[in-house]
Amino acid sequence: MTTTKKRPEVLVPAGTLEKLKVAVNYGADAVFVGGQAYGLRSRAGNFTIDELREGIEYAHARGVDVHVASNMVTHEGNEKGAGEWFRELRDMGLDAVIVSDPALIEICSTYAPGLNIHLSTQASATNVETFHFWKQYGLTRVVLAREVTMEELAEIRKRTDLEIEAFVHGAMCISYSGRCTLSNHMSDRDANRGGCSQSCRWKYDLYDMPFGQERKSIKGEVPEEYSMSAVDMCMIENIPDLIDNGVDSLKIEGRMKSVHYVSTVANCYKAACDAYMESAEAFYAIKDDLINELWKVAQRELATGFYYKTPTENEQLFGARRKIPQYKFVGEVVDFDPATMTATIRQRNVILEGDHVEFYGPGFRHFECDIKDLHDANGNKIDRAPNPMELLTITVPQEVKPGDMIRSTKEGLINLYQKDGSSKTVRA
């Protein structure tokens, strides 16, 4: 373990230019994005060259680094043009590329010397010898495989001076650090070249072959047949362990997720790191609030993955041990008039007069109120606003700022385990 605490970088996903700006404004120290080539998220709204330039300029002006994921597994011919791509990224001021394929690493080193290369989690780095190997080729950081334990992480830290990046939040692949071909076989989309259809998230029935007799999951251990769908990672409670063991960068998954998600996770992990760097007492004073905040954007149950032990089926597979989140993202503030306490908001979901909502902003600012004096952009009084991206005005009891987000509570479902291990779904 390190003797002096070092504040880690909070690395936040940004699937679009809008999300990049939100991540920066909500506390990210660095963001990772995808370009239009060599990445693994073909549907993430990847950045054009002009958007990359704008995003880098915006982030750098606020002291935030930008990394580009170029972590696809290349087949013969896929690498054509990569040298020019990496050189262009370097020349526009990019801080690092995230790469897994040795061919792309070699090309980047040759064509774009000086550009930091980070080894992607797709390369499945699970031991310090891997760090030693890639250091010879000029890499400056390694993103650990999600399967690495905290004990292994601590040992790696003692034996390398390369930067360590570790996933702390978001979706986990049921396969080994993304080495999966389910999508290739089931939907003809190559997961390792950006086309994953997330086949592991589908429902499955189990058949006893060759007789073809259907069998339910053993003893109800995997509710609702989500037999390959992993729960999500959340290490917010364990920030002290990550910092004490010298992790340089805390990586949050989710380039395809919403600005609601991006703003919330950036806010929470920045607050957690800042608090623990102040003192352990400061961290534990806000820990429960941080946990509750992250549940507001959760899509699945949350767990610590492989950090502390190999999880059992009931710990790792989706099946609901607590309620589905009861919050929905309804809008963001674009303007505020302090004289009339009127907020102009851009709507993202249906808003009704009288809805109970929560406003939140950078720095962990929160307050709740009811929607009052709802008007459309023409000043007409309305009771319901059903059209996404419409500009609306409301009266608020406290000051808000452009960029603040708005959530509405909604009726949800609760999935509970019963004594026999099966699941039961009830209304919230």
Locations of the language-model features?
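Surface-exposed amphipathic alpha-helical tracts and adjacent flexible/coil segments at the periphery
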Residues: M1-N25, A30-V33, A37, G55-I56, ...
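Glycine-rich, positively charged N-terminal anion/phosphate-binding segment
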Residues: R41-H60
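Radical SAM/AdoMet-radical enzyme domain recognition
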Residues: I56-E57, D95, T110, N116-H118
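Gly/Gly-Pro- and Ser/Thr-rich, intrinsically disordered tail segments characteristic of DNA damage-repair
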Residues: K80, L115, L119-V128
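Alpha-helix capping/helix-boundary segments
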Residues: A103-L104
